[in-house]
């Protein structure tokens, strides 16, 4: 009789578990799952671009600490500054089976190889079990992949523009640029700055030349064709309007290099080194992004009055007030984590906490946000 009762109990448990596996979890069940993960430590491998010199590194560290404290889980942080080397490492890790559990990465075409390989889980799939996942985001601002699905929960946005060291300009006899700044004025100012013994443009051509180059492309084209890329046919460059725009931009870059407006070691210096040249008053101009605001505030609080954000000089159809910005990065949950029930819950909770209204508000200073309620910075 006891054997029959035990068998019946096992059958009831199996039926109950099978029923749970195929339906959406209620809020109560989600809370139960979160409570369970708090009692058994889960290690999450997380890859981000919040490296040591990133302006939001401290905010990221605080968010991770809060997550670990609230869940009892442990984050194995594998963060580095965004660069081609970092991007290459991310691709290599996926190719060699060293997938992270959560990835903070570009939401554009760079993520498509991972999506096509089935390495990432869509937000739609996550919501089959966690219906409230990423519902604090504006749907229109969640990047859509080529397959029509959405994978990345947006983080903070960004803008790119011209940082100016006011002190260097004053010592060079150059005025702070206005909203109608032209390419011709910029070249004249660079020459004055060079003659005064300063570096006109802080830029590492060997590591991160693209912030400046993006504007040079726009200066030789238009907003409408900014994202168009040159094409090859049979190994030969197709000489069309796009190719001509890129060639003209490269010529402008070469003009700046030949004139000696970059650091003497621009072909070997790291981006960090050239940013320091700007921050410490050795260089006048730096084309960079909003993420640098936090870096300057934390690393050079005594010099903040010297830094001004101005417009990148305009040329052709582009007025100086046309800039570059948007939301280009977000959090992905990998298939590796999703297929592990414990890591699944831990990863969902991690992304949910890192992209909550409260947490993202600590990251946002002047950037675009996808939060429905908007960001409310504390400072």
Spans of features found by a protein language model:
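Short, solvent-exposed loop/beta-turn-alpha elements that line the ligand-binding surface or hinge
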Residues: 36, 124-136, 178-179, 221-248, ...
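Conserved N-terminal structural module of periplasmic/extracytoplasmic solute-binding proteins
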Residues: 6, 20-112, 116-117, 128-130, ...
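A local structural motif
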Residues: 69-80, 173-178, 254-268, 282, ...
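Extracytoplasmic/periplasmic substrate-recognition and gating elements
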Residues: 42-48, 65-70, 74, 172, ...
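Glycine-centered hinge/linker elements that transmit conformational signals in sensory
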Residues: 188-192, 234-267
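Short helix-initiation/N-cap motifs at beta->coil->alpha
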Residues: 80-89, 109, 181-187, 265-279
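Hinge/lid segment of periplasmic solute-binding proteins
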Residues: 30-40, 106-164, 187, 212-218, ...
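Extracytoplasmic/periplasmic solute-binding protein
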Residues: 146-155, 160, 185-237, 254, ...
